[in-house]
């Protein structure tokens, strides 16, 4: 299963609430909520957009859980 570290990144690196973080990365709050809670994996466009906004590699945010 694909997992992400969005909440960890938001809380430790940016110290923002989710609404502020959504504005920073340029996605809708409901989309972000679905991603952060692992209810949705996101499409490739959204994944790349977030990666670019955070200046991180995709694999630094998303990973395969063993």
Where do the language-model regions lie?
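Recognition helix of helix-turn-helix/homeodomain-like DNA-binding domains
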Residues: 26-41
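Short basic helix-loop element that most often maps to the first helix and adjoining turn
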Residues: 4-24
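DNA major-groove recognition helix of helix-turn-helix
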Residues: 10, 36, 54, 65
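Conserved hydrophobic/aromatic packing and binding residues within compact polymer-binding modules
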Residues: 6, 21, 32-35, 61
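Short amphipathic recognition helices of helix-turn-helix/homeodomain-type DNA-binding modules
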Residues: 60-66
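DNA major-groove recognition helix of helix-turn-helix/homeodomain DNA-binding modules
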Residues: 45-60
């Amino acid at each position: 299963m694909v997992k992400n570290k969005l909440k960890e990144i938001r809380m430790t690196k940016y110290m923002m609430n989710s609404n502020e973080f959504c504005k920073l990365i340029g996605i809708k709050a409901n989309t972000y909520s679905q991603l952060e809670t692992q209810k949705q994996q996101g499409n490739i466009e959204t994944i790349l957009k977030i990666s670019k906004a955070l200046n991180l590699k995709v694999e630094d945010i998303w990973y395969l859980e063993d």
